[in-house]
Structures are given as structure tokens and as C-alpha cells.
């Protein structure tokens, strides 16, 4: 019997671009359509595939309950001067948090951002996910990431390679960016409790601050998903990952 894995796809409401210029919004939506098409191809292989739509956030940016309020930038100009917390960062945090809080009765939850695609066949990609689940489960894993791994500044992993290599996988201290990752059911209560008792931040930084070196986290040796080039509503710039 296959484990019951839920995939939650975080998507932006295509009909509500707010004040984002049309050419930039068109870029975001083209990436989103490609991502939806890719994940709908594997949806029937999992216990649940859910699409969670949000309106792109251009209004809410609370300083209360923020882990680092001094870097909040309320400018609505489309510029990015890190370190910064923008409307886009808060919108993404809320979306990831909602997905985690709505984990449900599953063996694992996979959270996928709106622009993520994969190059494998749908069958191969599905198998990689189930293999990763079994690998992590056997090693008391809390989380598993399928994307490219980088590390937060000032972490020990950013100074030297702290990964433990195991064939097709590696154990890591933490991971940025968090665009396609799995949370095991054993971690559900803990991460929901952390969310209830900590301030908000850019989602991958929140994960880094709350999880660095604390629990077993794994990744595929090489990323099996990526985000295509195009406009980002979080970083306000073109990105290739």
C-alpha cells in the first residue's frame, strides 16, 4: 500500500493581478500554467492533490508578529534591496503557513510553489517522490527538499560542506529555497506549534531559523525540480533557479 501523500500547490488567482504591470503578470501566469500542467499530470498518483489559490499580496505587511520587523519595506515600488521583507514575502509566508496548517490526515505533505516544474517524465518524477519518502521515513526524517539547496548566511553549512552524502541523497542542516519540499507526518505537530509560537519571516528564512541542524532533513543529490526564468512577485526581478 502506498503512503498517503498530499500535494498542496500554492497558486496565485490569475484574475487579480492587483497593481502588477501586465507584462510582469503575464510572465508570472505563464510560469504558473506550466507548473499546473506539470503537477496535474501526476495528481492521480497521490492521495490528494490540492490547488490553493491566493490573491497576490500588495496590501498586508504586519510589523507585529514579525521576526525581523526592522527590515520591512512598505514601498510598493518593484525594487529589491535585501535584506528586506516585502508584501511578496508576507504573501508567500501566509500561503506556506496555510498549507502546513491544513496538513490533514496524511503520511506526508508536499508544498509546491506556483512556478515549479520538473524535467523527468511524470512517472519518473512520481517514483522519485515515493523513493524519497521511504528513504526519509527509514531515517526519521522531518523534511525532504526536491529543489536546489543553498544555505542561510552565517550558518555552519554556508562556511563548509556539512552535508552527509548517501548515494542518491544527502542529509543537510537546512535548505533555501523552499519551493518544493515534503514534511513528514511525524513533524506535523511540531511545525504547526512552531508556526503558532514564532514571528513571520520570508518562508525559507523562517524554516532556516527554526530548523537549522535541529532535525534530520534530506534532499535529492541533484535537484529534480526547478523554477524557470521569469518574473518573481516576491523578489521583483527575473530569476533562474
Predicted segment positions?
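An acidic/histidine-cluster motif and surrounding catalytic segment
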Residues: 1-112, 116-241
Amino acid at each position: 500500500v502506498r503512503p498517503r501523500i498530499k500535494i498542496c500547490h500554492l497558486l496565485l488567482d490569475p484574475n487579480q493581478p492587483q497593481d502588477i504591470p501586465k507584462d510582469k503578470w503575464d510572465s508570472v501566469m505563464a510560469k504558473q500554467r506550466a507548473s499546473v500542467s506539470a503537477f496535474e499530470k501526476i495528481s492521480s498518483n497521490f492521495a490528494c492533490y490540492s490547488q490553493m489559490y491566493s490573491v497576490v499580496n500588495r496590501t498586508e505587511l504586519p510589523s507585529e508578529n514579525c521576526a525581523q520587523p526592522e527590515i520591512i519595506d512598505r514601498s510598493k515600488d518593484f525594487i529589491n534591496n535585501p535584506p528586506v521583507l516585502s508584501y511578496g514575502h508576507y504573501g508567500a509566508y501566509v500561503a506556506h503557513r496555510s498549507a502546513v496548517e491544513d496538513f490533514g490526515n496524511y503520511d506526508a505533505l508536499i508544498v509546491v510553489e506556483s512556478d515549479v516544474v520538473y524535467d523527468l517524465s511524470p512517472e519518473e518524477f512520481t517514483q522519485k517522490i515515493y523513493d524519497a519518502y521511504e528513504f526519509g521515513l527509514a531515517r526519521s526524517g522531518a523534511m525532504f527538499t526536491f529543489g536546489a539547496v543553498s544555505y542561510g548566511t552565517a550558518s555552519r553549512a554556508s562556511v563548509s560542506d556539512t552535508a552527509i552524502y548517501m548515494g542518491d541523497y544527502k542529509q543537510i542542516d537546512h535548505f533555501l529555497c523552499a519551493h518544493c519540499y515534503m514534511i513528514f507526518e511525524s513533524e506535523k505537530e511540531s511545525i504547526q506549534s512552531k508556526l503558532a509560537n514564532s514571528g513571520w519571516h520570508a518562508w525559507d528564512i523562517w524554516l532556516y531559523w527554526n530548523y537549522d541542524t535541529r532535525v534530520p532533513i534530506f534532499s535529492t543529490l541533484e535537484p529534480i525540480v526547478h523554477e524557470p526564468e521569469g518574473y518573481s512577485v516576491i523578489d521583483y526581478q527575473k530569476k533562474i533557479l
